[in-house]
Design a protein with these regions (language model features):
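Non-heme di-metal
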Residues: 1-168
């Protein structure tokens, strides 16, 4: 049994991932102690909010035919990969995101969890991009990947900064 994906589904998933990322950053912000890390989480939380709105707008602008399947996956390999990624690494719900943030032992651990989430989000969207037809929204998926890449850079800098302060 195969599965097909549409550009519309990519944007729906993007919106869900951004919403869950916002929940993670909101909880991490509430638990953060240092002003610098609080600023990072606050900024990322706001960016997730903006990305959600951006992706919602992009989804609404998709031509009607992008809600139709754009690629067949007869062996369900891509589906199985994406399903495994979501179940093992990405937050399935906002509640799971908040629980992970609450479980972090310190700010650096919370930042590292955020970094893992953002990297996995990029992998997820790169796979979705690979199976979405160019004429039906692939370039729009690239926008999602670019936004998430900026998150990785921001979090990586924050980790380096926080670790530098902790080693002094």
């Amino acid at each position: 049994m195969g599965i097909s994906f549409s550009a519309d589904e990519v944007f729906e998933m993007a919106m869900d991932i951004e919403k869950n990322g916002e929940a993670y950053y909101r909880k991490a912000l509430a638990l953060a102690k240092s002003a610098g890390v609080k600023a990072v989480f606050s900024d990322l939380m706001e960016q997730e909010r903006m990305h959600y709105a951006t992706f919602k707008g992009l989804r609404e602008k998709l031509p009607p035919r992008t809600s139709l399947p754009t690629v067949a996956d007869p062996e369900s390999e891509e589906y199985l990969y994406l399903d495994a990624l979501v179940k093992s690494r990405l937050f399935s719900t906002a509640r799971e995101a908040e629980a992970l943030a609450a479980k972090a032992g310190d700010e650096i651990e919370a930042l590292k969890s955020a970094l893992t989430f953002e990297k996995d989000t990029i992998l997820f969207f790169q796979t979705m991009k690979a199976i979405t037809d160019e004429r039906l929204g692939r370039s729009e998926v690239d926008r999602i990947i670019e936004e998430e890449h900026r998150h990785v850079v921001r979090i990586s800098k924050a980790i380096k900064e926080a670790e530098g302060k902790g080693s002094r």
